[in-house]
């Protein structure tokens, strides 16, 4: 059957026809469902925030915000415990920043290659491979870093510091290894989101640029990428979130020791500190670990 608006309907199929009362009832029910879903999301965020505040606030009151944030010594189980997280916070900031510096250019150029340069057959192979990277568990990246990157970093460390008796060798588990692994892990996110943004740029903009005499490379960097800027920024933000929130892969390659975040030092990130100590901590120690969540 076809109604006056041209929409086909069956005896038991969907139809836009119906009484005003039934339509109003359906609208009301759907509005309630949407509202409940939205409230649930807000409640979840609020519950997490309240839990962190209640659990970590006692440590902030006992230790002090200034002492915790600017003290560099983390020895929660010592006879005179110290709960300084300055090096841990600094490591997370520096590690994430360098991972973004390494990963974003590679990811963006890869997205440009798939979207603008590669032949359709090549893109049909590369794009699924990138999407497959996004589905690989974090622990796999960590194991690959432990088996491949750490030994290479150790060889580099030996070559640089072989005549330095004061250097504490890390076996390759250092900040550089962690940054490389993080940079690799954010690639799928940056590539996929950037690719989607580039594909959303109207073809007419590219054609107009080429018609004015611009080369393909000039069109890519002067027209296409600027037009997709908002989506690329979103890709970077998501990459930052992925990098700063990663734990399991980094705990395998970073050495997980609280040190100044220098390239060849074993370091600890906020997330790896939480993973490492939450299981056995108690009392003020546990509360201080929960305070690391505030920084995140």
For each predicted feature, which ranges?
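Transmembrane alpha-helical segments of polytopic membrane transport and secretion proteins
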Residues: 1-38
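Short membrane-interfacial helix/loop motifs at transmembrane-helix boundaries
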Residues: 43, 49-82, 257-264
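Membrane-interfacial helix termini and adjacent extracytoplasmic/periplasmic loops
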Residues: 62-86, 142-184, 254
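Transmembrane alpha-helix signature in integral membrane proteins
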Residues: 85-113, 296
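Membrane-cytosol interface at the C-terminal ends of specific transmembrane alpha-helices
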Residues: 100, 113, 168-211, 215-218, ...
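Cytoplasmic-entry segments and transmembrane alpha-helices of multi-pass inner-membrane transporters
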Residues: 106-145
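Transmembrane alpha-helices
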Residues: 132, 136, 193-194, 216-251
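Interhelical loop and adjacent transmembrane-helix boundary motif
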Residues: 250-295
